[in-house]
Amino acid sequence: MSLPTLKSAWRPALRMAAGGVLLLGLAGTALAQVDTGKSTISAVSKQMNVPVDGKFKKFTASVDFDPAKPAAGKAQFSVDVASYDLGDESFNKEVRGKDWFDAATFPNATFVSTAIAPAGAGAYSVSGKLTIKGKTSDVVVPVTFKQDGANQVFDGVLPIKRLQFNIGQGEWKDTSVVADDVQLKFHIVSAAKK
């Protein structure tokens, strides 16, 4: 049996996992409407020790954050896993499949915050529930915050293990080909409520 190109199968799965983690980071966003045109969610993984980076093109978010009252903050995010883009449609199609994200069965990865705590110097720890491919895990996302005029900007990276979420099944469980570690990265821009 011939396997799909390693890059095609591995990239999408890692990106999907990253998307879920990024959702966690987004949970630290603001009293605001998220500007998805200025915001990004991506996943970085390694295939045969070569970094692979993909972006989620579609996501929605509901956030409420005031840096003066971080404990009162909350966020919910949903990422369309079929929107994961590795820059090649054949790769994108592979990662949407059953062995990777199984987008037909599990169309969205979600994050719902449960607590936000200050971590010093514009940093926050955002705790919440990350769900990818039907598997839910408690996570803590380190998030940095800065005020940029009327906008609030949140950045962060959440490391996850793809196999914990059943991303990369069958022959793709082999972590010597596609690493288990995935970095979910996010840059979220939101405009304060008026």
Feature map (PLM): residue ranges:
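Low-complexity, acidic/polar, glycine-enriched regions of mature
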Residues: 30-194
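Bacterial N-terminal signal peptides that target proteins for export
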Residues: 2-20
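C-terminal segment of classical bacterial N-terminal signal peptides
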Residues: 15, 20-31
